[in-house]
Swiss-Prot record:
Belongs to the thioredoxin family. DsbA subfamily. Its main location: periplasm. This is Thiol:disulfide interchange protein DsbA. It holds the Pfam family DSBA. SUPFAM superfamilies: Thioredoxin-like (SSF52833).
């Protein structure tokens, strides 16, 4: 019993120590907005953004965050339209990916096509990436101008405007907290990824 007691104390102290490391203005910024009723994490990115490529495809930060979240926490990723000549087209394409449930298939292929091979130069090229991901051209075209996709595009644009988004990658917790990349430990990739996920987990339960 005594061993169990000390073990529990150790867990509490470890949690308190890690929580104490995170403060407003350093690892996150508290926004002058009401918190969402349900816990949620909202990430903004762009297929044109080199830092987003690193964030998603090299560091795999969103994957680490997902794993750290309490069960039932909603995590959503939105594309921004203010970067690149096809920014609006890619935001619409991301809405298609969301509607069809193929975000995980599209993400690596589209990042590669936009940034590495640079084979996405016109709207038609975006369709080809979906075809490569296993979505037929007919299915893509049918979804592109659907009501669902139009609604998802509007949601992405409204969320970015409401949060006065100025850059990506960006992650918001409960609509009230924004993670500050420059306040995190970047001395090692593993340390950065773990701390990022820990800050998000801390903010999810912050009252």
């Amino acid at each position: 019993m005594k061993k169990l007691w000390f073990a529990l104390i150790g867990v509490v102290l470890a949690f308190s120590a890690s929580a104490a490391e995170f403060s407003d203005g350093k690892q996150y910024v508290e926004l002058d907005k009401p918190a969402t009723q349900e816990p949620q994490v909202l990430e903004f990115f762009s297929f044109y953004c080199p830092h987003c490529y690193q964030f998603e495809q090299v560091y795999h930060v969103p994957d680490a965050v997902k794993k750290a979240l309490p069960e039932g926490t909603k995590m959503t990723r939105y594309h921004v339209d203010f970067l690149g000549p096809l920014g609006k087209n890619l935001t619409q394409a991301w809405a298609v990916a969301m509607a069809l449930g193929v975000e995980d298939k599209i993400t690596p292929l589209m990042f590669d096509a936009v940034q590495k091979t640079q084979t996405v130069q016109k709207p038609e090229d975006i369709r080809e990436v979906f075809v490569k991901a296993g979505v037929s051209a007919e299915e893509f075209d049918g979804a592109l101008n659907s009501f669902v996709v139009k609604s998802l595009v509007a949601q992405q644009e409204k969320a970015a405007a409401d949060l006065q988004l100025r850059g990506v990658p960006a992650m918001f917790v409960n609509g009230k907290y924004m993670i500050k990349n420059d306040g995190l430990d970047t001395s090692s990739m593993d340390g950065y990824v773990k701390q990022y996920a820990d800050v998000v987990k801390f903010l999810i339960t912050k009252k």
